[in-house]
Amino acid sequence: MDAWVRFSAQSQARERLCRAAQYACSLLGHVLQRHGASPELQKQIRQLESHLSLGRKLLRLGNSADALESAKRAVHLSDVVLRFCITVSHLNRALYFACDNVLWAGKSGLAPRVDQEKWAQRSFRYYLFSLIMNLSRDAYEIRLLMEQESSACSRRLKGSGGGVPGGSETGGLGGPGTPGGHLPQLALKLRLQVLLLARVLRGHPPLLLDVVRNACDLFIPLDKLGLWRCGPGIVGLCGLVSSILSILTLIYPWLRLKP
């Protein structure tokens, strides 16, 4: 199995390039349709998108083994929340790839009796569950980092003898004893949390990249499952952005979120 995992890893770059091209075609097709391009040109773009999708399915054959190996490694993580989110995400990815393999067999003619609509819905359902777990993991890591950053800021303020912004020692408008002061205090706390979030994400590019990539990918299964119709333009744009970010993590491995 290890040999197969290494082999499938070598095809990741080609698969992600095909993915970027596929969603670029989806976006281009939407733009051409909006601008009244010739039906023949639109048909060619749709055919190219379909060929790229089928090619990606071929490149993903056996990726279930890679996902299962990743799940086996994640089981040994010491953090319970990370262990749960990452393991469940990889297991859903394995099921997604398995459904994708069945779809490839149906589209390529090897299994013509396959109900492609049913298997496509199954694959997107597992894909959606995987993305939800990924975003849950991102939210958990962000919360941990924000708590660490907040504690560090508090220690620095205590060391310098400064007060905590928006604390009980602040008087005047917005103080706890001032009528209507709770709303300004809430706004100040919210602003501080947003600034803290921005600082955390700016200081951790892999986490920022992972959040944006998963958020972009989320639109794809939501649209395909009919849970939130975004349209081919939004799906194409989000898929293209996500694919470019995935390619960046291959070119620059330090941008990949670990574990």
UniProtKB/Swiss-Prot annotation:
Task: Describe the family membership recorded for this protein in Swiss-Prot or TrEMBL.
Answer: Belongs to the peroxin-11 family.
Q: Per UniProt, what is the name of the gene that codes for the protein in this document?
A: PEX11B
Recorded GO CC terms:
peroxisomal membrane
The entry's keywords? Acetylation, Membrane, Peroxisome, Peroxisome biogenesis, Transmembrane, Transmembrane helix
Record-annotated membrane-spanning stretches: 234-254
| UniProt organism field | Pongo abelii
What's the domain of life for this entry? Eukaryota
Mitochondrion found in the keyword field: no
Q: How does it sit in the membrane?
A: Single-pass membrane protein
| GO BP term, example | signal transduction
User: Could you identify this protein by its name?
Assistant: Peroxisomal membrane protein 11B
Indicate where this protein is primarily found: membrane
Task: Write out the ranges of the annotated region (Interaction with PEX19, PEX11G and FIS1 and peroxisome targeting).
Answer: 211-259
Q: Which residues carry this modification: N6-acetyllysine?
A: 43
- Per its database record, what is this protein's job? Involved in peroxisomal proliferation. May regulate peroxisome division by recruiting the dynamin-related GTPase DNM1L to the peroxisomal membrane. Promotes membrane protrusion and elongation on the peroxisomal surface.
Quaternary form?
Answer: Homodimer. Heterodimer with PEX11G. Interacts with PEX19. Interacts with FIS1.
State the compartments where it is located: Peroxisome membrane
